[in-house]
Curated annotation (Swiss-Prot):
Belongs to the bacterial ribosomal protein bL35 family. GO terms for molecular function: structural constituent of ribosome. It comes from the Bacteria. Gene3D superfamilies: 4.10.410.60. InterPro entries: Ribosomal_bL35, Ribosomal_bL35-like, Ribosomal_bL35_CS, Ribosomal_bL35_sf. This is Large ribosomal subunit protein bL35. GO terms for biological process: translation. One of its GO terms (cellular component) is cytosolic large ribosomal subunit. Keywords: Ribonucleoprotein, Ribosomal protein.
């Protein structure tokens, strides 16, 4: 059986933590930032965890992570 391929777009967006949870970056931070408040932009910094309902989909896309 051939090797499973990693979805490269998912590999660039997600990283697996040591405990097994998957981290992702926040959305809505790329452009159109002038109308967003400073507080809103500050809260969009950093990383967030992938929700449990999306975990199976992400794991399928990252078979070797």
């Amino acid at each position: 059986m051939p090797k499973m391929k990693t979805k490269k777009s998912a590999a660039k967006r997600f990283k697996v933590r040591a405990g097994g949870s998957i981290k992702r970056s926040q959305a809505f931070k790329r452009h159109i930032l002038t109308k967003k408040t400073t507080k809103n932009k500050r809260q969009l910094r950093g990383v967030a965890a992938v929700h449990a309902s999306d975990m199976v989909s992400v794991r399928v896309m990252l078979p070797y992570a």
